Amino acid sequence: MRKFCIYGKGGIGKSTNVGNMAAALAEDGKKVLVVGCDPKADSTRTLMHGKINTVLDTFRDKGPEYMKIEDIVYEGFNGVYCVESGGPEPGVGCAGRGVITAVDMLDRLGVYDQLKPDVVIYDILGDVVCGGFAMPLQKKLAEDVYIVTTCDPMAIYAANNICKGIKRYGNRGKIALGGIIYNGRSVVDEPEIIDKFVEGINSQVMGKVPMSNIITKAELRKQTTIEYAPDSEIANKFRELANSIYENKKTTIPTPLSEQGLDELTESIEELVRRKYE
């Protein structure tokens, strides 16, 4: 069973990548399970053509003793199995705790043993790597982590913070960094910035997803790009990315950038923006 996590800043394109990679891997004949670990519960939206009941909602409505696998596992596009952890009501409780509860419930119900997926993908919010959102790292639920980022300074800052969490648990032999997914959707689209960041943290770029209006059109229809435009160039980019990650054997314990290193990278971005728009 191939298991990996996708982390990244909120709104950076994690779910876009996860949905399309899952669809691509399923298209290739693999049985895929996607576990959304984001309180927005939208990780599987394009696979399911809408939202599904979350583990936490079902937990609150039925109680854990009455829950069944079919209450929380749904089958979406290309036969991809979908689960959403969900979160507390706004202003109440801890979203990270929701991830912990969801992961525990999947274990209790024997989801992995019964479904026997070939691939499990965890889609995890990475703005703050607290105890809940770091659960897949702590419990070694996955073999490696992939971080989605753009050239935006705050996205890189979040990616660097995630690397700190991976380093903490990686040094205990629990997890490793597989690489960076470059989402080319920020104002500054400069691969050299990401190359510099990747070199600094001792990792690799797994692939670049360029900006495309096809992705936007697909998501407005609540579809993956693989479903909406299967023969498009951007769909093939997602297929290449999915295969690259599935086959990847090269992992590292990252070396997060220091504050000074981040400042220097930010200055490089500012210089590129100035040159581009002045």
UniProtKB/Swiss-Prot annotation:
The reversible ADP-ribosylation of Arg-97 inactivates the nitrogenase reductase and regulates nitrogenase activity. The gene is nifH. InterPro entries: NifH/chlL_CS, NifH/frxC, Nitrogenase_Fe_NifH, P-loop_NTPase. One of its GO terms (biological process) is nitrogen fixation. Belongs to the NifH/BchL/ChlL family. Pfam families: Fer4_NifH (PF00142). [4Fe-4S] cluster binds at C94, C130. This is Nitrogenase iron protein. It catalyses: N2 + 8 reduced [2Fe-2S]-[ferredoxin] + 16 ATP + 16 H2O = H2 + 8 oxidized [2Fe-2S]-[ferredoxin] + 2 NH4(+) + 16 ADP + 16 phosphate + 6 H(+). It is an enzyme of class 1 (oxidoreductase). GO terms for molecular function: 4 iron, 4 sulfur cluster binding; ATP binding; metal ion binding; nitrogenase activity.
